[in-house]
């Protein structure tokens, strides 16, 4: 499908996830009246794409804006550079302009829950554990078929490779929106292991790398191409990453703890993915990208009784130069490896 009419084009990775669907719904709900919107749904499987588009189309019809919203899709895997290269070819062919890229990448490699630790931590350190759970067990040493750390490639390197290859489509006002996390912290990254191969919490480490890579690339993108990069976080919400390890009783208990945490004042407890999508969509639809705080991480928040809010967190970006240089080196190497493919 080649899109010629004037429309705001938004590409969402991980669009079939709970948060991805919520972002799509909020884009439909909050777009300007009579404005045209093209949502490009991406996933690794055709089944997930079909479900996502069917859900979003039904939402657009229910909101009586069906004719004003178009859908397209791409199938690719952020843990496969050949797949990424194919997606880049398709994006360049279909779209002369991309207004926003939303990277909702969420490769975590969870393999279970440490239940004794969970019970101890939730009993003795409830606030810190509910916001930053230490009981989730992640696989260590997982590499992609390309030989990179899986979480690093899927959440950090693959997305940045795409951004740097799509500067022509994004230039002069395009936005890149990163879904970071409140769990991001410098303690989860060792600069001697940037690919997170030996990291016991590669998901949290990848979110920290997203933050510092943004700090490295954001000024360059803006100065050289007029592209704006933003860090956002969706707070805490129900997602499938942990739910698959819960039975009906533990899932109910999780919901109770989330609502209790919100009642005692933890505004990060969005719970509903739709509330988590608040800030990413607000940034997407903002008409003055230069006015937004790009040096902060902008977070979706919810008050005790469900009122939506926004939070801006000033971050420390130690390691930005090292991480940025490492990504740059990888980008150069993969451009050389992929140069003989169609582009």
UniProtKB/Swiss-Prot annotation:
**Gene3D superfamilies membership:** NAD(P)-binding Rossmann-like Domain (3.40.50.720)
InterPro entries attached to this UniProt entry = Ergosterol_Biosynth_ERG27 (IPR051593), NAD(P)-bd_dom_sf (IPR036291), SDR_fam (IPR002347)
Catalytic positions are 180, 203, 207
Instruction: State the EC number(s).
Output: 1.1.1.270
Named in its record, the pathway it takes part in is: Steroid biosynthesis; zymosterol biosynthesis; zymosterol from lanosterol: step 5/6
Among SUPFAM superfamilies, the record links this protein to: NAD(P)-binding Rossmann-fold domains
Report which superkingdom the organism of origin falls in.
Eukaryota
Q: Which family does it belong to?
A: Belongs to the short-chain dehydrogenases/reductases (SDR) family. ERG27 subfamily.
| Name by which UniProt lists this protein | 3-keto-steroid reductase
